[in-house]
C-alpha cells in the first residue's frame, strides 16, 4: 500500500499472531474475482503487527476483521492490478505455529502474550481451527488468482 500512496502503521487493535479470525468480505469484495466462491466470513493463517491506515487512491476495500479494517484491498498502480491481502491463504497453520514458536521470546517481550497460559490457549485455538479447516475455502484466493493470470 505504501508504494502506491497509502499509509501503514502499527496496528491499533492488536496483531494477528498465526491466525486472523472472522474476516468478513464486504459487498465490494463479493463482486471481486479474488473472492469468487469464498465463504463470506472465514478464518485464515496470518501474521502481522501493522495495519493499512490509509488506502491508496482508487483502492477498493474488499474485506476486514476486528483487528484490521483492511484485510483485503484492490487497486491499480501504473499498468498493474494489485490485490493486497493481510493474511496468508498460501500458508498452513502448521507454518504459523512454527513462526510463533520461533518468535515466542519476542512475543512475550512485546507483551503479545502476558503468560504461558495465554500463549498455550492461543496455540490451542489455532490447532482447533486447523481441525475445522476447509482447505478449498482457505486456498480459494490462490486458485482465483492463478485462474485470473492464466486468462
What is the role of each PLM region?
Residues 1-29:
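Cysteine-nucleophile active-site neighborhood
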Residues 25-151:
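Amide-donor transfer/coupling interface in amidating biosynthetic enzymes
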Amino acid at each position: 500500500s505504501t508504494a502506491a500512496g497509502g499509509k501503514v502503521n502499527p496496528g491499533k487493535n492488536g496483531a494477528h499472531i498465526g491466525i486472523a479470525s472472522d474476516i468478513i468480505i464486504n459487498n465490494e469484495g463479493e463482486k471481486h474475482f479474488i473472492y469468487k466462491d469464498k465463504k463470506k466470513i472465514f478464518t485464515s493463517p496470518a501474521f502481522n503487527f501493522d495495519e493499512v491506515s490509509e488506502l491508496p487512491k482508487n483502492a477498493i476495500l474488499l474485506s476486514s476483521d476486528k483487528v484490521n479494517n483492511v484485510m483485503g484491498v484492490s487497486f491499480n498502480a501504473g499498468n498493474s492490478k494489485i490485490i493486497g491481502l493481510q493474511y496468508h491463504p498460501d500458508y498452513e497453520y502448521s507454518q504459523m505455529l512454527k513462526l510463533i514458536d520461533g518468535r515466542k521470546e519476542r512475543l512475550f517481550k512485546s507483551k503479545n502474550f502476558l503468560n504461558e497460559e495465554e500463549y498455550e490457549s492461543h496455540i490451542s485455538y489455532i490447532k482447533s481451527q486447523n481441525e475445522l479447516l476447509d482447505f478449498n475455502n482457505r486456498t480459494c484466493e490462490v486458485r482465483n488468482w492463478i485462474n485470473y493470470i492464466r486468462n
